[in-house]
Every structure is written in structure tokens, then in C-alpha cells.
Swiss-Prot record:
Encoding gene per record: bet
Taxonomy, superkingdom: Viruses
Oligomeric form and interacting partners: Bet interacts with host APOBEC3Ca. This interaction does not induce APOBEC3Ca degradation but prevents its dimerization and incorporation into virion.
Native source organism of the sequence: Feline foamy virus (FFV)
Protein name: Protein Bet
Free-text function comment from the UniProt entry: May be implicated in the establishment and/or maintenance of viral persistance. Bet is required for viral replication.
Region listing for Disordered, in residue ranges: 1-33
């Protein structure tokens, strides 16, 4: 299967990478460490992500035990098109490493990956993947330790990192269940385990066998994220009341989400269009599919003014609130979102984004949001009069 991602650039030797040489959107990787508040907030997000992932997986009734101990290590990488990667040790300073992306097509039989895709305000799309395996170790080709670039699939930094942590001189001796390195094929790697079947993707991720990987994948780059933006949100992470990240019960109910099995809009094949429409019609009595955090108590009916917080300016991509404007950072284009809502939802469905933008599904040829525009003028006028 051909890779969906373009060819990556050369991998630079050395652990400390110059992040200024990479262009990314969403989370500014160069700002980490400069703003003392930034790492703390991101680490808080990662901690809550782990708790949220646990709750999500428990609801799947997955047979067999998950890895019992959560590792403090969380692997995060920004975009499949870049090799910029950050390995975060929760509670300690951020460390910079290089990894190769591309695990999307991996895994059958011995390897099971459960994924959830979520939108973190101010960060971008985050994909959580939990791994369940019978065989934990995929051996790494020995040339990695020498840093040879003759093999484009080789990731020397990752191999050096793991072997250094385990005090192993030759990565072929790394037969520990704590780590999982990638292999090439039986011809290149005599220690290839034929029982471990992996459908190889170019630059197959040397995925860590700790249970959770967090993929920070920014909306403006990957077309998959363009299809994910209406899905699950982690807006609740900024508002959650739980002091303890393990207090899953106080986190999980705070977000209303679509059923991924029916609203699978990020490339997988679970749930066809008929099933999605059927599910939407069955739940149409709710009147709206809200991605906003919900209260733990009974839901209070939103007033018209609260529902219509904003409308879309398709040129400047601004949020227009009564009394002021706010820039939209890292969000997908309003034109695309309008088309998406019209295609994916029955006519008349109200969809509210975490940032307050509201869409009403209509026939694609109709001009959308006329009511919102009229309401905005009235609300802005009322706000100005009150001031």
C-alpha cells in the first residue's frame, strides 16, 4: 500500500533538534520553555487525555487485559508530514527526539490498536491510540545503531534512545517487553518474528508498547483532520473540575460526542452513510448535536441568544460575538465546514462547535446561516446600546 504522506526530509543526528527549521501550525513547538505557563497546560491536557482514553476503552469491553501500568511516557508528534517529534515525560522537562510517523496502517492479529480522535482547543487534533499485543517486541535492524542512512526506514535516534535507556549496546539484543522497535523484513533482520504480522507502512512508527500514544495532528495540514473537526472535542479539558486525572467519572460525562461507529468521518469504514443518517434521525428529537461541554446535572435549554453566539465571516474567519470579535486560531475554513455539515447531517440539524460557531444543515445550493446573520445584527446592536 502506498504511503499517503509525502517523502520526509533528512533526519538530523543528535537529540536536540532545531525546531525553528520546521514549519508547523497549531501548537508552537518553539515556544515550549519560553512561556512557563505553556508546558504546564499541555501536560495537564496529556494527563486528562490518558484518563479519557482509559474511560473510552473501558466502554468498549475489550477482551483480554490492557497493559496494567500506565507509563509516564507519552509519545506525541505534530504532523505525519514532519519528523518533528516530542517525547514527553510527565512531570519532568520536555525532551526533544525524532521519530518516524506512519503507524496508521499497522496491526492485525497480534497487534490491536484502539484509536480515538479528539480536538483540543489551541492545540489541534489529538489521536489517542491504545495498544493490545501478544508479542511485544519488533526487533530493530542493527544498522540503526550506527546511524546509517542507507536504509530510509531506519530511525537511529529512536534506537539509540531506547538502547541507551536499557544499557544495551546492540539493538538486536533489545528483547524487553517494555519497548517495541520496528523491524524491516526476514531478509534484512535475522531476528524477525514470523508470528508478528505487521502490514508495513513506509516509515513504520517504532511504537512504544506503553499503552497510550498521543498524536498531535494539526488541522491545517492533514486531510484526515479536515474530516475529524466535527467529531469529539477535548474542550472539557480546560473546564474540567477534576483535580485528579484518574477521576474519570467526572471527566467523561462532560462532553456530548457522536457515536464514532455511526459518524465515522475520519477515513475508516465503520458505518455507512445510511447508518449515519438513520442514527441522526433516531436522535433528531434532541434538536441539535452539540460538541459543547455539558453539565453533569440536567441539561438546561439554551436560549436563542446563547445558541446563536456567532456567525461566520467567510473571508476573515473571525468569530463575531455580541460586543466584540475574536480570532479563530487553528480552525478549519468555514466554507469547508459549511459543506461538511450540509453533507453529513440531515437538513435542519443544528451543529455547535466548541468555539461557539453554529451551523444549520441545509440544502447545499442554499446560502447558509441567513438567520444567524440577522440575529447577529440585532444582538450586536443590543449589546452596543447596553454599553
Amino acid at each position: 500500500m502506498a504511503s499517503k504522506y509525502p517523502e520526509e526530509g533528512p533526519i538530523t543526528e543528535g537529540v536536540e533538534e532545531d525546531f525553528n527549521s520546521h514549519s508547523t501550525s497549531g501548537l508552537d513547538l518553539t515556544s515550549v520553555g519560553k512561556n512557563p505557563e505553556h508546558p504546564r497546560r499541555i501536560l495537564l491536557v496529556l494527563q486528562h487525555l490518558i484518563a479519557y482514553a482509559e474511560a473510552t476503552i473501558k466502554k468498549q469491553d475489550v477482551p483480554g487485559p490492557l497493559l496494567p501500568i500506565l507509563s509516564p511516557y507519552v509519545m506525541a508528534w505534530d504532523n505525519p508530514q514532519n519528523v518533528v517529534t516530542r517525547l514527553v515525560n510527565l512531570g519532568e522537562s520536555w525532551k526533544k527526539y525524532l521519530l518516524s510517523p506512519g503507524w496508521k496502517d499497522c496491526g492485525e492479529r497480534d497487534l490491536t490498536m484502539l484509536t480515538r480522535e479528539l480536538l483540543v482547543p489551541g492545540i489541534g487534533l489529538v489521536q489517542i491510540a491504545a495498544t493490545l499485543t501478544k508479542t511485544y517486541v519488533l526487533m530493530c535492524n542493527g544498522r540503526c545503531i550506527t546511524g546509517s542512512r542507507t536504509d530510509p526506514d531506519c530511525d537511529p535516534l529512536f534506537c539509540k534512545l531506547l538502547c541507551w535507556k536499557q544499557n544495551i549496546q546492540d539493538p538486536r539484543e533489545c528483547n524487553l517487553e517494555e519497548w517495541c522497535l520496528y523491524s524491516l523484513d526476514p531478509e534484512h533482520d535475522p531476528l524477525w518474528d514470523p508470528k508478528m504480522i505487521v502490514r508495513r507502512h513506509r516509515n513504520l512508527l517504532p511504537y512504544c508498547m506503553r499503552p497510550f500514544l498521543i498524536w498531535m495532528n494539526y488541522i491545517s495540514h492533514n486531510p484526515l483532520t479536515q474530516q475529524c473537526i466535527m467529531m469529539k472535542t477535548l474542550n472539557m479539558l480546560w473546564r474540567a473540575q477534576a483535580d485528579d486525572p484518574s477521576d474519570v467519572a467526572s471527566l467523561y460525562p462532560r462532553v456530548k460526542v457522536f457515536k464514532a461507529s455511526h459518524f465515522d468521518i475520519f477515513g475508516s469504514a465503520s458505518g455507512n452513510s445510511e447508518e449515519r443518517v438513520s442514527w441522526a434521525k433516531e436522535n433528531s428529537h434532541r434538536g441539535e448535536y452539540s460538541l459543547l461541554p455539558s453539565s453533569d446535572d440536567e441539561e438546561e435549554e439554551m436560549s436563542e441568544r446563547e445558541e446563536l453566539l456567532c456567525h461566520i465571516n467567510q473571508c476573515q474567519q473571525k468569530l463575531f460575538y455580541p460586543g466584540g470579535t475574536t480570532d479563530v486560531l487553528g480552525m478549519e475554513s468555514n466554507v469547508w465546514l459549511t459543506k461538511f455539515v450540509n453533507i453529513k447531517f440531515p437538513k435542519g440539524t443544528k451543529v455547535i462547535l466548541p468555539d461557539g460557531r453554529k451551523f444549520i444543515a441545509c440544502d447545499p445550493e442554499l446560502k447558509p446561516l441567513l438567520q444567524e446573520l440577522k440575529f447577529l445584527d440585532r444582538a450586536t446592536s443590543e449589546s452596543s446600546d447596553s454599553e
